[in-house]
């Protein structure tokens, strides 16, 4: 019996991306599904860099590791995939960022209901004529075929059996798995039902995948039925938009095309008039702009590792394809703004994170433009020799010396019909690793080897220092004297001591090891004192480093550990303050901030965190106030051990990439901070005393650092500042309260002097340029003036060029170049100003001056009528101007 379709007017059929998304979720909500918000692109699953599928947030539920949120759920999940990045823009349907609409059953309904609803959604809600639909089933899934044929009523000729590679889903080599069934849209049903080939991408597009999780696969590959069978489906929003909006590809839907149009406007081109290469570049920019906006919004910062590298790669591809279209000025911020405008209704978080998104785009583009100019120049030199292949050594030089990504070298090579010797590249990379390894300076390798050997032969040390600072007794398990294993040590010996249990904290989690004493009777009863200067860990074994101050120490001796209380108090105050700092940063700056590293010692603390911009002074002030408020609240800390899943469910903050045991230690400042942490802490926030931020700075791309002091160290810091203030007061002959006023007055004087100097330079440029007009020469129907003008800055040179253009008329091309500071050959400025009649010949000032600037080791660009570029080789300026003159004579003549 076929499933009935209710009539639905064409006007009511969803068309826009937003309508399709809302209609899908409403359809399943009406059928008892709980609507779930999209999860972050940064998954909780540590085995996956990014959220790559709609089911990924539910994977722990499917695997039985987590309680189901409801028997039925539906979502629109944002996803990122980069495994087919080279196909983005070249095919009709490959993307990096996409939205996956899905409906899920956790042990509730199963195959027949999922199939019936999928068909009803496609044909009734979305109004697709069944003659345009084809379904696939797993070759052994007779049940699914029977449902499609006998229950839904699909023509048997339009039910295609597929192999395991296409229609069988598995979470891994073992575990839950099952067959799947897919619905395809047929763009050309008039071609008939005979010999249907679903691999024909021009005719068919798969838009809905239904996974029937009904088996468990064991290590031998045996399939056994699951007690609770599940449904996992995915419908591609972009693909459905293409179908319903009747456009040639996903890129021309309202989900992406506004970004393509924004990029086309920046490039001054018409998408529909471009060749395939030009359209591909616009599609890449449109696709990647959505992806990078969402990645940054969810807390990813560009870097050379993991998901940060994926973001950096996408950003650099956008810039690269922009340049192929003639966009030489920075434009990522503009594309970011367009992306935010397009995404904000579905994802309001992009508005909340707008400042962070745009700052990261601007910072990363600025860095890459410098890299790109250097790398493209070298690569152009390589290509000029017309090689058959880019050698591995050349690709590695681009990567190692110029920071030019290998993927970009491959792309540019492909554009010229070449490939890259990847084996040679890897060989050069390995040689570099070996050179770095050989050059590395390692302190006392023999000692480290000895410690490794000792640690390998012993059981882990029992740490008792959370509760004890003075120990009743412990036994010496092993001893190193001056770097070598020994049975005993005496006065003056430098030692490494391993005990069976210890109150000393071993360095870890950013916190330094404790200091203190080991005391005992000694073998001769005359006493023993070992001064411990640091404690490290090696495979769970605590190694106490120090010097024997009195007596003799031997393996098997009983000693008593005494931790330096003052040092421990300072370290644990700084450690708890670090937790408060992270909590305050999340509250004041951005909830998505994550720890990148930390150092907690006896004097101060240092906290590194992912953030694309500097923390503002007013934010630092807020953070200080917030932390000191929490200190004043005198809150008692709660420390508990619990299962890792329980800790995460409770909201405990974990450091990404860190490996944790099944049972973890959770340090909780109630209502303020909860973190997984093995370090030592104060019992009450009041013990910290006071907190003061010393500095905020950048340490790497997307990584900021705050250094701070707490407790008694704050007083020492303030005393140092007081000395500095006194010295400044003496220097300016001012009281402390007058120093700022004096400095502001001096700055104003300097500013006025700089303005006067700039004005004088501009006047000089105008005066000099008036005299240059006589150097103009007639070239056909045009006037051409190419001249050198040193001692003038960029604004002055532009003003001079425009003045000459006004003086000589609309049929004039003016090119000026010079050294702003004649004594500095490392900075060149070039300006081009073209009249309308010159532009009408096809010349554009921006493209022209950018090409000339490359001759001076630089680059730049601008508008068709006025553009400025820079260079780094003053010695090449005259030759560059001669080239400009010759090129324009040839073009305008």
UniProtKB/Swiss-Prot annotation:
GO terms for cellular component: cytosol. It is found in: Cytoplasm. PROSITE patterns: AA_TRNA_LIGASE_II_ALA. Its cofactor is Zn(2+). Zn(2+) binds at residues 575, 579, 677, 681. It catalyses: tRNA(Ala) + L-alanine + ATP = L-alanyl-tRNA(Ala) + AMP + diphosphate. Its EC number is 6.1.1.7. It is an enzyme of class 6 (ligase). Catalyzes the attachment of alanine to tRNA(Ala) in a two-step reaction: alanine is first activated by ATP to form Ala-AMP and then transferred to the acceptor end of tRNA(Ala). Also edits incorrectly charged Ser-tRNA(Ala) and Gly-tRNA(Ala) via its editing domain. Belongs to the class-II aminoacyl-tRNA synthetase family. Consists of three domains; the N-terminal catalytic domain, the editing domain and the C-terminal C-Ala domain. The editing domain removes incorrectly charged amino acids, while the C-Ala domain, along with tRNA(Ala), serves as a bridge to cooperatively bring together the editing and aminoacylation centers thus stimulating deacylation of misacylated tRNAs. PANTHER family: ALANINE--TRNA LIGASE, CYTOPLASMIC, ALANYL-TRNA SYNTHETASE. This is Alanine--tRNA ligase. It comes from Synechococcus sp. (strain CC9311).
């Amino acid at each position: 019996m076929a499933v009935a379709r209710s009539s639905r007017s064409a006007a009511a059929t969803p068309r826009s991306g937003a309508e399709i998304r809302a209609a899908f979720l409403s359809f399943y909500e009406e059928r008892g599904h709980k609507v779930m918000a999209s999860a972050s692109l940064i998954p909780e699953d540590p085995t996956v860099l990014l959220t790559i599928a709609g089911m990924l947030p539910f994977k722990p539920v499917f695997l039985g590791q987590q309680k189901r949120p409801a028997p039925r759920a539906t979502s629109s999940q944002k996803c990122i995939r980069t495994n087919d990045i080279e196909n983005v823009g070249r095919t009709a349907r490959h993307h990096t960022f996409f939205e996956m609409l899905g409906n899920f059953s956790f042990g509730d309904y199963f195959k027949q209901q999922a199939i019936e609803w999928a068909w009803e959604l496609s044909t009734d809600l979305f109004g697709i004529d069944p003659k345009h639909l084809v379904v696939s089933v797993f070759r052994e899934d007779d049940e699914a075929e029977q449902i499609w044929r006998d229950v839904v009523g699909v023509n048997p000729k339009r039910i295609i059996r597929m192999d395991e590679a296409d229609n069988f889903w598995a979470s891994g080599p073992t575990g839950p798995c099952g067959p799947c069934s897919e619905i395809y849209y047929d763009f050309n049903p008039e071609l008939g039902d005979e010999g249907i080939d679903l691999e024909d991408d021009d005719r068919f597009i798969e838009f809905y995948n239904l996974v029937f999780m009904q088996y468990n696969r064991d290590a031998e590959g045996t399939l056994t039925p699951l007690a609770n069978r599940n449904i996992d489906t995915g419908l591609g929003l972009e693909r459905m938009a293409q179908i319903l909006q009747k456009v040639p590809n996903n890129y021309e839907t309202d989900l992406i095309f506004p970004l393509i149009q924004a990029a086309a406007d920046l490039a001054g081109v018409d998408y529909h008039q471009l060749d395939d290469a030009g359209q591909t570049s616009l599609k890449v920019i449109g696709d990647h702009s959505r992806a990078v906006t969402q990645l940054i919004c969810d807390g990813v910062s560009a870097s050379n590792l993991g998901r940060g590298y994926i973001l950096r790669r996408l950003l650099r591809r956008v810039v690269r394809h922009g340049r192929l279209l003639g966009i030489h000025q920075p434009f990522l911020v503009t594309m970011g703004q367009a992306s935010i405008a397009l995404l904000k209704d579905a994802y309001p978080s992009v508005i909340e994170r707008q400042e962070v998104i745009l700052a990261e785009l601007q910072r990363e583009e600025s860095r890459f433009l410098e890299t790109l100019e250097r790398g493209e120049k070298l690569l152009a030199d390589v290509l000029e020799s017309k090689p058959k292949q880019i050698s591995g050594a050349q690709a590695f030089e681009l990567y190692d010396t110029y920071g030019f990504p290998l993927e970009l070298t491959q792309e540019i090579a492909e554009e010229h019909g070449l490939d890259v010797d990847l084996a040679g590249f890897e060989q050069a990379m390995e040689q570099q690793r070996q050179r770095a390894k050989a050059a590395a300076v390692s302190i006392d390798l023999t000692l480290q080897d000895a410690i490794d050997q000792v640690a390998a032969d012993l059981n882990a040390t029992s740490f008792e220092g959370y509760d004890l600072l003075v120990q009743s007794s412990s036994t010496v398990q092993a001893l190193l004297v001056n770097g070598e294993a020994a049975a005993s040590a005496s006065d003056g010996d430098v030692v490494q001591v391993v005990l069976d249990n210890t109150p000393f904290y071993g360095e870890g989690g950013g916190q330094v090891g404790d200091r203190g004493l080991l005391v005992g009777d000694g073998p001769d009863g005359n006493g023993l004192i070992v001064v411990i200067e640091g404690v490290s860990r090696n495979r769970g074994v605590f190694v106490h480093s120090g010097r024997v101050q009195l007596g003799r120490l031997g393996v098997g001796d009983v000693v008593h550990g005494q931790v330096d209380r003052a040092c421990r108090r300072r370290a644990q105050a700084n450690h708890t303050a670090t937790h408060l700092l992270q909590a305050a940063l999340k509250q004041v700056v951005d909830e998505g901030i994550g720890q990148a590293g930390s150092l907690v010692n006896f004097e101060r603390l240092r906290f590194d965190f992912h953030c694309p911009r500097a923390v503002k002074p007013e934010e630092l002030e807020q953070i200080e106030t917030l932390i000191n408020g929490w200190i004043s609240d005198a809150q008692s800390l709660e420390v508990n051990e619990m299962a890792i899943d329980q800790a995460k469910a409770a909201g405990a903050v974990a450091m990404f990439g860190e490996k944790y045991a099944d049972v973890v230690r959770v340090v909780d400042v109630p209502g303020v901070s909860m973190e997984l942490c093995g370090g030592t802490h104060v019992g009450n926030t009041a013990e910290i005393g006071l907190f003061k931020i010393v500095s905020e700075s950048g340490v790497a791309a997307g990584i900021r650092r705050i250094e701070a002091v707490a407790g008694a160290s704050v007083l020492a810091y303030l005393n140092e500042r007081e000395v500095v203030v006194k010295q400044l007061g003496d220097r300016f002959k001012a009281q402390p309260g007058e120093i700022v006023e004096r400095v502001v007055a001096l700055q104003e004087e300097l500013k006025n002097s700089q303005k006067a100097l700039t004005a004088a330079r501009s006047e000089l440029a105008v005066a000099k340029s008036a005299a240059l007009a006589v150097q103009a020469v007639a070239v056909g129907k045009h006037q051409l003036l190419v001249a050198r003008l040193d001692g003038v800055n960029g604004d002055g040179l532009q003003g001079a060029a425009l003045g000459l253009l006004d003086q000589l008329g609309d049929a004039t091309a003016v090119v000026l170049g010079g050294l702003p500071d004649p004594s500095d050959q490392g900075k060149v400025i070039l300006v081009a100003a073209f009249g309308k009649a010159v532009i009408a010949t096809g010349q554009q000032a921006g493209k022209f001056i950018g090409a000339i600037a490359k001759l001076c080791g630089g680059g730049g660009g601008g508008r068709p009528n006025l553009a400025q570029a820079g260079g780094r080789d003053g010695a090449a300026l005259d030759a560059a101007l001669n080239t400009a003159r010759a090129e324009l004579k040839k073009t305008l003549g």
